[in-house]
């Protein structure tokens, strides 16, 4: 099905302004999912914050209980010893300090996540212009600067997603693959939303979770009725 036809098919199945129970929203998306690859199911959450204010920016990470369906390559900056061994035992593809930095500067950037122990940030700091634009710079707010690199690696590989409000105060995130069953997708979305609620800025007023929409990789969004979710 051509993309334009798929978009029209989803649009035709969605009543303007209507919020659908989660299961119904996912059914609409899966019915129209005809890509030659397994599409992701993504969520957009509009928050009741003013993203222009530094104290209302929402940033963090969530470990999705059903995972993301993606294979994740992880690099860890940690000094030789217990921390490095811990990261390797957890499944990190690369662990090092200056040697790892040199490899990255030479073009080895085939990683989805970069983690660092606090004492390794002196090395990582030199890679800011390299890692920053790629969204790979370790940050304590999303759990990628950690004194427990083994745990951080396990989280990254077991389905950790990172989020940050954009200029329109919207969070964009994946909650799995279209091949996931509905309960897996639902548990992932609920875990994300619960963490977003925990991250609510103290200065945010009014309705916080203003709108939740789900979409497939190639399709438009379908608004989810939040009452169909368990957010307590």
Swiss-Prot record:
According to its UniProt entry, the protein's GO biological process terms are: regulation of translation; translation
Q: Does the keyword rRNA-binding apply?
A: yes
| Cellular-component GO terms for this entry | cytosolic large ribosomal subunit
Per its UniProt entry, which superkingdom is the organism in?
Answer: Bacteria
InterPro entries, per this entry? Ribosom_uL1_bac-type (IPR005878), Ribosomal_uL1 (IPR002143), Ribosomal_uL1-like (IPR023674), Ribosomal_uL1/biogenesis (IPR028364), Ribosomal_uL1_3-a/b-sand (IPR016095), Ribosomal_uL1_CS (IPR023673)
**Gene Ontology MF, one:** structural constituent of ribosome
Keyword entries, A-Z: Repressor, Ribonucleoprotein, Ribosomal protein, RNA-binding, rRNA-binding, Translation regulation, tRNA-binding
A UniProt-annotated Pfam family: Ribosomal_L1
Is this entry keyworded Magnesium? no
Q: Name the CDD domains for this protein.
A: Ribosomal_L1
The record's note on quaternary structure and interaction partners says: Part of the 50S ribosomal subunit.
Q: Which NCBIfam families match?
A: rplA_bact
What's the stated role of this polypeptide?
Answer: Binds directly to 23S rRNA. The L1 stalk is quite mobile in the ribosome, and is involved in E site tRNA release. Protein L1 is also a translational repressor protein, it controls the translation of the L11 operon by binding to its mRNA.
The family this protein is said to belong to: Belongs to the universal ribosomal protein uL1 family.
- This chain's protein is named Large ribosomal subunit protein uL1
* Species: Xanthomonas oryzae pv. oryzae (strain KACC10331 / KXO85)
Instruction: Point out the gene that encodes the protein.
Output: rplA
């Amino acid at each position: 099905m051509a993309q334009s036809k798929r978009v029209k098919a989803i649009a035709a199945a969605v009543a303007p302004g209507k919020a659908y129970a989660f299961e119904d929203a996912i059914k609409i998306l899966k019915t129209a999912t005809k890509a030659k690859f397994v599409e992701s199911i993504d969520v957009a959450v509009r928050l009741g914050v003013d993203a222009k204010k530094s104290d209302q920016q929402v940033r963090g990470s969530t470990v999705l209980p059903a995972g993301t369906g993606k294979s994740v390559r992880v690099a860890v900056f940690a000094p030789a010893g217990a921390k490095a061994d811990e990261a390797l035992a957890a499944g990190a593809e690369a662990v090092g300090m200056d040697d790892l930095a040199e490899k990255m500067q030479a073009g080895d950037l085939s990683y989805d996540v970069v983690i660092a122990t606090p004492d390794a940030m002196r090395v990582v700091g030199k890679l800011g212009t390299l890692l920053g634009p790629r969204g790979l710079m370790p940050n304590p707010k999303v759990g990628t600067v950690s004194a427990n690199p083994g745990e951080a690696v396990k989280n990254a590989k077991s389905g950790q997603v990172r989020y940050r409000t954009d200029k329109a105060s919207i969070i964009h995130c994946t909650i799995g693959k279209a091949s996931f069953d509905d309960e897996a997708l639902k548990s992932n979305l609920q875990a994300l939303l619960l963490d977003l609620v925990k991250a609510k800025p103290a200065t945010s007023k009014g309705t916080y979770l203003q709108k939740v929409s789900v979409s497939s990789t190639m399709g438009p969004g379908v608004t989810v009725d939040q009452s169909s979710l368990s957010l307590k």
